[in-house]
Amino acid sequence: MTELTEADAADLFRAPPDRMVPVGGAEVAVRTVGSGPDTLLIHGWPVSGATFRRLLPHLARCATCHVVDLPGAGASRFT
């Protein structure tokens, strides 16, 4: 795996999400990066998954990071 830089992590949140997951009345955006044990990163309110952009280069070295945008934040949307 190529090492993820902070700039790469920032670009990750400018691009469309890897997948949209239906949850209740919403579609939750999920981005996945890294390799290793699965790690779920859930942001607080009123921010988005992009809040982890500086942390991702470090975590992605040893974990598969699944970063979600909660409904109403980032690329997620209510349906």
Predicted regions located by residue number:
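Conserved HGGG/HGGXW glycine-rich cap/lid loop of the alpha/beta-hydrolase fold
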Residues: A26-F78
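An N-terminal hydrophobic leader/cap segment in hydrolases
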Residues: M1-M20
